[in-house]
From Swiss-Prot:
Keywords: ATP-binding, Biotin, Ligase, Nucleotide-binding. SUPFAM superfamilies: Class II aaRS and biotin synthetases (SSF55681). It holds the Pfam family BPL_LplA_LipB. This is Biotin--[acetyl-CoA-carboxylase] ligase. It comes from Mycobacterium tuberculosis (strain ATCC 25618 / H37Rv). The gene is birA.
Amino acid sequence: MTDRDRLRPPLDERSLRDQLIGAGSGWRQLDVVAQTGSTNADLLARAASGADIDGVVLIAEHQTAGRGRHGRGWAATARAQIILSVGVRVVDVPVQAWGWLSLAAGLAVLDSVAPLIAVPPAETGLKWPNDVLARGGKLAGILAEVAQPFVVLGVGLNVTQAPEEVDPDATSLLDLGVAAPDRNRIASRLLRELEARIIQWRNANPQLAADYRARSLTIGSRVRVELPGGQDVVGIARDIDDQGRLCLDVGGRTVVVSAGDVVHLR
């Protein structure tokens, strides 16, 4: 057993339920499973069968078919990450605002881990739309998928992976100097932060957008956006609009991007 293996005890489902499920909480159900293909796919399947997944949390110790944006895989090591999906009812919110939900999730993840890591604020933040970066490495990612009347938000947060266990451009809490990251505490804090940000999103609270802009590493940067159709656009990221889209200054004209992969250029 390696030192990292010793830092990978199982999650305590009962404790998480005791902390997060109850009167006044937005979370109605929480389950921890040893292994699944994809927590997002599992909640989407429940929604398709007619189940009410609003406020449902599904956490997996290991994912064998995790997915990132645009159909890419999400690497996973057993008990080395926090891998979870939640269901959010969205039909009572204007569809134009749905794009901000995944941005809110990224902000919640960032807020849950930023106090733990000794990284200057200028090196920790959000890459549009919702990647959590620290020292240039990807620490966490979000995948939002619609299954009306719900959106399923998936979170993958790297906790104790070694460099060889993650993609070259990724990092983990352990490698950022968190000596013994406690996944139970982090998961609990993350879900509390996520609940608070969902409430802000649902209420159209302007503080959500203000906080996101303050923590954005993309706004003000020269970027290349790789669009889903295979084209690229290069410009200065100026803002995020009220639909969660990235607004670029491209040679003096504004180009609005709703989906794509951002590369920060030097």
